[in-house]
C-alpha cells in the first residue's frame, strides 16, 4: 500500500521502527550514551513525523503517486519521483528533500547554478519513457521540500493551525502551467495553496505568486539544462578548475565552499573579484534559453 494511504498509527509505527534500526547501525551505546543524544533522537522522530504528515497532506490533494524513491542515475540520486496517468499521458514530477532554506531560482539555473532539480527531472522522464509502453510522458514539476518542524502561533481551531503549519512547509520549485497538470497536482484549488507554490485568482487564472511556466517554456528550461549540463561536463574534462567564484543576488560561490580556506581566493586583495552574474526576469531568462536552443549556441 502506498504510504500516503496508510493510517497515521501505521506511519508512526514505521517511523519508530526505521529510526531504531538506524540507531542500531550506529551502535546503541553511542547514541544513547548521553541525555543530549537521547533528546536528539526524540527530536529526529518528531521531525520525521511532521515531514511525513505534511508530505501525506500534499499527496492526498492530488492524483500523483510515488513511483520511486532514492532512484540512482549516474552518480546522482533522486529522492522521490511521482507520476500520474491521464489516459495516454504520464505526468512526472520530482521532489528533493532539503534541510536548508534553498528556493529554486531559474536565473541561477540559466547561469549554470541550481541545475540539480531539472537534471533530476530529465533523468526521471527518460526512465518513465522506457516504462510508459507507448504513452506520452510529460513533465509536471520540480520541487524542494524543506525538512523542518516549524513553530507557529496558536490558532482558534485545529484546522487553522494545520493550515498555518502546512503553509510553512509548502513546496518550492517550478510547475508546468498546463491545466491538466495543475488539476492533477491539487484538486479544487482556490486562492493561494498552502501545499504547492501556486494559487488562483477569482476568475480561475493562476495568480502572480504561482511559480509556473507555460508548457513550451517549461520544455525549453529542460532542453537548456541538457545543453548546460553537457557544457559543464566538457569544461570539467578539459581541466577548467580555476578559482573563479560567482556573485548573484548577494550570494557567492564561496559562501558554503569546503575549500575556501585553501584555494587562495580573497576578494579583499588586488586582482581578485567575484564573477558578477546578470539578473534577469523570468520571462527574459526563458527568452534567452529559447534563443540559445534555437540558434544551437553554447549556453553562456
Residue ranges, per PLM feature:
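Structural signature of nuclease core domains in nucleic-acid processing machines
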Residues: 1-300
Amino acid at each position: 500500500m502506498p504510504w500516503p494511504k496508510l493510517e497515521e498509527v501505521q506511519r508512526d509505527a514505521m517511523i519508530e521502527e526505521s529510526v531504531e534500526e538506524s540507531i542500531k547501525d550506529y551502535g546503541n551505546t553511542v547514541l544513547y550514551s548521553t541525555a543530549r543524544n537521547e533528546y536528539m533522537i526524540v527530536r529526529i522522530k518528531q521531525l520525521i513525523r511532521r515531514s511525513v504528515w505534511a508530505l501525506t497532506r500534499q499527496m492526498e490533494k492530488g492524483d500523483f503517486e510515488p513511483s520511486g524513491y532514492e532512484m540512482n542515475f549516474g552518480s546522482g540520486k533522486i529522492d522521490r519521483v511521482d507520476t500520474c496517468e491521464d489516459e495516454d499521458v504520464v505526468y512526472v514530477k520530482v521532489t528533493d528533500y532539503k534541510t536548508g532554506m534553498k528556493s529554486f531560482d531559474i536565473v541561477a539555473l540559466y547561469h549554470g547554478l541550481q541545475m540539480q532539480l531539472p537534471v533530476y527531472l530529465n533523468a526521471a522522464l527518460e526512465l518513465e519513457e522506457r516504462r510508459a509502453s507507448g504513452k506520452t510522458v510529460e513533465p509536471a514539476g520540480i520541487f524542494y521540500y524543506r525538512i523542518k518542524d516549524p513553530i507557529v502561533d496558536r490558532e482558534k481551531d485545529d484546522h487553522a493551525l494545520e493550515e498555518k503549519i502546512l503553509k510553512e512547509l509548502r513546496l518550492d520549485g517550478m510547475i508546468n502551467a498546463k491545466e491538466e497538470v495543475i488539476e492533477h497536482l491539487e484538486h479544487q484549488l482556490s486562492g493561494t495553496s498552502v501545499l504547492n507554490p501556486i494559487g488562483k485568482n477569482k476568475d480561475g487564472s493562476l495568480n502572480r505568486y504561482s511559480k509556473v511556466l507555460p508548457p513550451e517554456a517549461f520544455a525549453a528550461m529542460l532542453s537548456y539544462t541538457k545543453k548546460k549540463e553537457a557544457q559543464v561536463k566538457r569544461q570539467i574534462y578539459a581541466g577548467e578548475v580555476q578559482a573563479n567564484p560567482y556573485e548573484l543576488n548577494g550570494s557567492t560561490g564561496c559562501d558554503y565552499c569546503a575549500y575556501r580556506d585553501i584555494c587562495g581566493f580573497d576578494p579583499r586583495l588586488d586582482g581578485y573579484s567575484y564573477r558578477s552574474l546578470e539578473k534577469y526576469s523570468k520571462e527574459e531568462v526563458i527568452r534567452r534559453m529559447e534563443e540559445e536552443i534555437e540558434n544551437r549556441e553554447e549556453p553562456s
